[in-house]
């Protein structure tokens, strides 16, 4: 679930913020594009130098969030979620579960008939087969 939420949020961020339509430019117009780019760069430098730090704070900023799946383990004291949940239940509960499993061997609720098995080749694979 964590991976799907992360991948969905990453996809939404890519589609909403980073979507820029691209167009092919003929080779003859490359000189014009370079001239326009130089003009744009010079205008942006002038605009940045004229703006004070106070006016920059008023603008909206983009926040990029990068997450690592190993980070969740570090946040939960190095334990995955299911182990953290078992640890929160307490050590007594974990021990009683082991005792219950050991007690089930003495009185099984489902009878299991064990037979001597032999290996028979079926096709290219050895499968268990029983003597009659």
From Swiss-Prot:
Domain of life: Eukaryota
GO cellular component, one term: synapse
Keywords: Cleavage on pair of basic residues, Disulfide bond, Hormone, Neuropeptide, Signal
Signal peptide, first to last residue: 1-24
Protein family membership: Belongs to the melanin-concentrating hormone family.
Protein name per UniProt: Pro-MCH 1
A molecular function GO annotation: type 1 melanin-concentrating hormone receptor binding
PANTHER family named among the record's database cross-references: MELANIN-CONCENTRATING HORMONE, PRO-MCH
Role of this protein: Plays a role in skin pigmentation by antagonizing the action of melanotropin alpha. Induces melanin concentration within the melanophores. May participate in the control of the hypothalamo-pituitary adrenal gland axis by inhibiting the release of ACTH.
Tissue: Pituitary gland. Produced in neurons of lateral basal hypothalamus which project both to the brain and to the neural lobe of the pituitary gland from where MCH is released.
UniProt xrefs under Pfam families: Pro-MCH
S-S bridge residues: 120-129
Gene behind the chain: mch1
Any one Gene Ontology BP term: chemical synaptic transmission
Naturally occurring in which organism (per UniProt): Oncorhynchus tshawytscha
């Amino acid at each position: 679930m964590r991976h799907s939420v992360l991948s969905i949020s990453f996809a939404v961020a890519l589609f909403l913020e980073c979507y820029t339509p691209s167009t092919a430019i003929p080779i003859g117009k490359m000189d014009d594009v370079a001239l326009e780019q130089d003009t744009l760069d010079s205008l942006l430098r002038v605009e940045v130098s004229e703006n004070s730090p106070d006016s920059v704070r008023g603008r909206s900023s983009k926040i990029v969030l990068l997450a690592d799946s190993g980070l969740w383990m570090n946040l939960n004291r190095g334990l995955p979620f299911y182990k953290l949940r078992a640890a929160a239940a307490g050590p007594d509960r974990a021990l009683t579960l082991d005792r219950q499993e050991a007690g089930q061997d003495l009185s099984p609720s489902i009878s299991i008939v064990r037979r001597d098995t032999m290996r028979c080749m079926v096709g290219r694979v050895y499968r268990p087969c029983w003597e009659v």
